[in-house]
Curated annotation (Swiss-Prot):
Its EC number is 4.1.1.39. The record marks K334 as: Transition state stabilizer. It comes from Flaveria pringlei. The modification N6,N6,N6-trimethyllysine is found at K14. The gene is rbcL. Mg(2+) binds at K201, D203, E204. The active site is at K175, H294. The modification N-acetylproline is found at P3. It catalyses: 2 (2R)-3-phosphoglycerate + 2 H(+) = D-ribulose 1,5-bisphosphate + CO2 + H2O; D-ribulose 1,5-bisphosphate + O2 = 2-phosphoglycolate + (2R)-3-phosphoglycerate + 2 H(+). This is Ribulose bisphosphate carboxylase large chain. The modification N6-carboxylysine is found at K201. Binds 1 Mg(2+) ion per subunit.
Length: 485
């Protein structure tokens, strides 16, 4: 290269490494209505200032790289770069900060959760300058929300399809989750459905294994549904898990379910992936199928408080990608779920508009405009004694799913289903009469046992069962103040 050429090429470009905060930390920035806003919990490495750490997150999740490159001059960084516009310390933690980052909408493909996450929670999570990084919340602007179809049907359409109103829906996961033959599996479904449940469910890891191929399971479960419907006069369903190794196979299973005339299929959206989930959601919308979503693998992502991604973000992403139900924790059962935090993302699933409320972990006001809502599913270690609390916590627009709490009944599956249905109806009636489920719940259940021997037997079996472990997912508080209290 001649000296003249070298001089021209280097005009306005200075090679080397410079601090991220010089370009990407902009505390004076005023966010736009069209920006995607993110709240990251940042734990910098020793010696890294929080402003530099926050700016590094903004850079590495948008336009930046580790060094200055000459092609920066071929585009408008001010238009496309992410901006860290705020840093605040986390109460009670010595070296944790909440970094607020704004992303221009043009960085993201329309209608693609996959593309959104590839940028926002991509390589930046392995960045050496950070000891740990967690995405706590996202604000999805209405301009971006409108590029998604969202849930195939939504809460009201599902109730109309099922002709069931004024109470939570009842479900049961068939156990043992693996090992049953298709015929025995179908028989277990039938017993639960005729006993009074609305749904039975494939467990998340039931796909198409040697002991029970998917087509056989679909056929026997469809038979169980139609037989139970004929006997009870109620519409019934079974969550037929269409999750498969390829998108083509997944859709083939969904097509077969539609041909059988069943009302609902299921997908493991995290292990299956957002691209597959959105494709299945579009198919279900076009073909009148409800879509139940299981969150298997979520705890790998959201369990640690200082690294990963909070479930409220995964819940928002699911509402965008599409699903009519999603598991959301129970507050009272065996699986993770602190009450205020759980209710925060339950509202994010169901409501049209949710105000910022840090007391429930909600960092941003979220407007879903016309996107349909998702029913939260309470499942995991729950039984009849939990029914008053579950009814009070989750309200009518929910699915209460008892696996062992149905199938573990000493008299069998159908009596287990009867016990749960009676307990639910008793709680709903008591609530409608103005009684306080939180304080009178046990009394309400005991009164109902007088006219339901099935419920009485269930209450006796599970009277001592408790899951007394501290939740990992808790709200941030000042630890020194807590000790003084």
């Amino acid at each position: 290269m001649s000296p003249q050429t070298e001089t021209k090429a280097s005009v306005g470009f200075k090679a080397g490494v410079k601090d991220y905060k010089l370009t990407y930390y902009t505390p004076e920035y005023e966010t736009k209505d069209t920006d995607i806003l993110a709240a990251f919990r940042v734990t910098p490495q020793p010696g890294v200032p929080p402003e530099e750490a926050g700016a590094a997150v903004a850079a590495e999740s948008s336009t930046g790289t580790w060094t200055t490159v000459w092609t920066d001059g071929l585009t408008s960084l001010d238009r496309y770069k992410g901006r860290c516009y705020g840093i605040e310390p986390v109460p009670g933690e010595d070296n944790q900060y909440i970094a607020y980052v704004a992303y221009p909408l043009d960085l993201f493909e329309e209608g693609s959760v996959t593309n959104m996450f590839t940028s926002i929670v991509g390589n930046v999570f392995g960045f050496k300058a950070l000891r740990a990084l967690r995405l706590e919340d996202l604000r999805i602007p209405t301009a971006y929300v409108k590029t998604f179809e969202g849930p195939p049907h939504g809460i009201q359409v599902e109730r109309d399809k099922l002709n069931k109103y004024g109470r939570p829906l009842l479900g049961c996961t068939i156990k043992p989750k693996l090992g049953l033959s298709a015929k025995n599996y179908g028989r277990a479904c039938y017993e639960c459905l005729r006993g009074g449940l609305d749904f039975t469910k494939d467990d998340e890891n039931v796909n198409s294994q040697p002991f029970m191929r998917w087509r056989d399971r679909f056929l026997f479960c469809a038979e169980a549904i139609y037989k139970a419907q004929a006997e009870t006069g109620e519409i019934k369903g079974h969550y037929l898990n269409a999750t498969a190794g390829t998108c083509e196979e997944m859709l083939k299973r969904a097509v077969f379910a539609r041909e059988l005339g069943v009302p609902i299929v299921m997908h493991d959206y995290l292990t299956g992936g957002f691209t597959a989930n959105t494709s299945l959601s579009h198919y279900c919308r076009d073909n009148g199928l409800l879509l139940h979503i299981h969150r298997a693998m979520h705890a790998v992502i959201d369990r640690q408080k200082n690294h990963g991604m909070h479930f409220r973000v995964l819940a928002k992403a699911l509402r965008m990608s599409g699903g009519d139900h999603i598991h959301s924790g129970t507050v009272v059962g065996k699986l993770e779920g602190e009450r205020e935090i759980t209710l925060g993302f339950v509202d994010l699933l169901r409501d049209d508009f949710i105000e910022k409320d840090r007391s429930r972990g909600i960092y941003f006001t979220q407007d879903w405009v016309s996107l349909p809502g998702v029913l939260p599913v309470a499942s995991g270690g729950i039984h009849v004694w939990h029914m008053p609390a579950l009814t009070e916590i989750f309200g009518d627009d929910s699915v209460l799913q008892f696996g062992g709490g149905t199938l573990g009944h000493p008299w069998g599956n159908a009596p287990g289903a009867v016990a749960n249905r009676v307990a639910l109806e008793a709680c709903v009636q008591a609530r409608n009469e103005g009684r306080d489920l939180a304080t009178e719940g046990n009394e309400i259940i005991r009164e109902a046992t007088k006219w339901s021997p099935e419920l009485a037997a269930a209450c006796e079996v599970w009277k001592e069962i408790k899951f007394e472990f501290q939740a990992m997912d808790t709200l941030d508080t000042d630890k020194d103040k807590d000790k003084k209290r």
